[in-house]
Amino acid sequence: MKAVVLTLAVLFLTGSQARHFWQQDEPQSPWDRVKDLATVYVDAIKDSGRDYVSQFEASALGKQLNLKLLDNWDSLTTSFSKLREQLGPVTQEFWDNLEKETEALRQEMNKDVEEMKTKVQPYLDEFQKKWQEEVELYRQKVEPLGSELREGARQKLQELQEKLSPLGEELRDRARTHVDSLRTQLAPYSEELRQRLASRLEALKESGGASLADYHAKASEQLSALSEKAKPALEDLRQGLLPVLESFKVSLLSALEEASKKLNAQ
């Protein structure tokens, strides 16, 4: 039940990142989120791709061509794994520097969200209470119908469905009413929070010491540094791919030549 209330709070207020302010868990850093997503994505591609290559090599055409794609695929994934390991510290340094530069702004925004959370909590508690009452009322109305079903079994199933339909619609309508009421109650606070965040950004833009232009320049500087530090790792990847591509090229040309000889011999 609390999860429903927390979800509604997120929808009415700040967006997906707001969930970290309404829960006790510490939020992941941007780098942690990027790293986790990239790891899952790359691993999924690697595993599924290897399966496809293995299936192709096991087919009649794959056996005839004998391209040894599976060996090349393993070499390729090893090169990508090495690249990921080399870039890890570099990207971590980039996120650390960026977070340090924006620490003051994030602290001010966190404080605004915490204050707004305190203001809207009574409305969320009231909504949760009303929702629990509606669910309990629905359960009380449905319970006798369940007894009828057990007694009459199949012949009364259709009757039960007909009786449950209006009850379900009633619960839906009453829930919609409570949600609309909650939205109306939270609207001023949502607007206040939006204005506060806009004010923070405007003040940041007008300040001489820490302007948005400064953040943009620093972020660009960090990205340039990241690009420079990544060049050696990318070059290593390119060098690692050359033997793989050359081996694939030789195997393919050999297979085509063999196929051409067989066609000419027929």
Curated annotation (Swiss-Prot):
Classification lineage: Eukaryota, Metazoa, Chordata, Craniata, Vertebrata
Database matches in Pfam families: Apolipoprotein (PF01442)
Chain residue ranges for the region called 10 X approximate tandem repeats: 67-266
Gene Ontology, cellular component aspect: chylomicron; endocytic vesicle; extracellular vesicle; low-density lipoprotein particle; spherical high-density lipoprotein particle; very-low-density lipoprotein particle
The Sequence repeat ranges on this chain: 67-88, 89-110, 111-121, 122-143, 144-165, 166-187, 188-209, 210-231, 232-242, 243-266
Function per UniProt: Participates in the reverse transport of cholesterol from tissues to the liver for excretion by promoting cholesterol efflux from tissues and by acting as a cofactor for the lecithin cholesterol acyltransferase (LCAT). As part of the SPAP complex, activates spermatozoa motility.
Protein name as catalogued: Apolipoprotein A-I
Originating gene: APOA1
Subunit structure: Homodimer. Interacts with APOA1BP and CLU. Component of a sperm activating protein complex (SPAP), consisting of APOA1, an immunoglobulin heavy chain, an immunoglobulin light chain and albumin. Interacts with NDRG1. Interacts with SCGB3A2. Interacts with NAXE and YJEFN3.
Modifications the protein undergoes after translation, according to the UniProt entry: Glycosylated.
UniProt xrefs under InterPro entries: ApoA_E, Apolipoprotein_A1/A4/E
